[in-house]
Design a protein with these regions (language model features):
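Post-signal-peptide N-terminal segment of Sec-exported extracytoplasmic proteins
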Residues: 37-70, 74-78
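Thiol/selenol-based redox catalytic cores and closely related redox-interacting motifs
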Residues: 91-157
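C-terminal motif of bacterial Sec signal peptides marking the signal peptidase cleavage site
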Residues: 20-23
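Bacterial N-terminal signal peptides that target proteins for export
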Residues: 2-13
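Histidine-centered metal-binding segments
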Residues: 172-194
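Short active-site loop/helix that positions an aromatic residue
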Residues: 76-84, 145-147
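Bacterial lipoprotein signal-peptidase II cleavage site
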Residues: 25-32
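Short functional micro-motifs and their immediate structural scaffolds
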Residues: 29, 53, 154
Length: 194
């Protein structure tokens, strides 16, 4: 009888310990924030390793349970996100609203849900890497920018894929040769995207 009592006590202690551990996991889950975060001078692009704020134009970020990945451009964010292994991470994506920000220095107070944004491609506005996709919360603001530049187009998040990014990069950088990336020391238009 004493053996059976010890066995039941051990089983009870193991179950109690398991419940305590399970409860700790719930608290940790509740503390995870998926809100956008500010960009800082020492942030490196997750894709290319360049300093994120050294370049003009909208930036992107992917906020996950385990942290934040930052990107020097919206195109770099899409390049990362469109990889099959990254799409399953359930990251929340954010981009700057260029309807509320200056092109040369986007305002981190105006980071918006990238999946709800409208993107303008085909403008001469320079960004960090590859195609410059100007991001907007408001479709009308995006259409106003596109109307200012012949050949520019407005597309929603779900219409951007790898082929679209490649075509946009080729159209924007057609004559730049192998070094298709503008350098941070080059002069850029100092006007706002809106």
């Amino acid at each position: 009888m004493k053996i059976r009592y010890n066995f039941n006590l051990r089983l009870l202690l193991v179950l109690l310990f398991g419940l305590i551990l399970a409860g700790c996991g719930d608290k940790e889950e509740a503390q995870v924030s998926y809100d956008p975060v500010a960009f800082h001078g020492d942030d490196e692009c997750h894709v290319c390793g360049m300093m994120v704020i050294d370049f003009p134009g909208p930036k992107g970020q992917a906020v996950e349970r385990d942290g934040v990945r930052k990107f020097c451009s919206t195109a770099e964010m899409f390049s990362w996100y469109l990889q099959p292994e990254n799409r399953i991470l359930q990251a929340r994506l954010y981009v700057h609203d260029m309807g509320q920000s200056h092109w040369e220095q986007p305002d981190d107070e105006h980071l918006i849900d990238a999946t709800q944004a409208w993107y303008v491609t085909g403008t001469p506005l320079q960004g960090a890497m590859g195609a410059s996709l100007a991001s907007f919360a408001d479709q009308q603001a995006a259409e106003e920018l596109a109307a200012q530049h012949e050949g520019a187009q407005v597309v929603p998040f779900d219409q951007i894929d790898q082929e679209f990014l490649q075509q946009a990069a080729a159209a924007q950088h057609g004559g730049m040769g192998h070094d298709m990336h503008p350098h941070p020391t080059e002069s850029h238009d100092s006007h706002s995207a809106h």
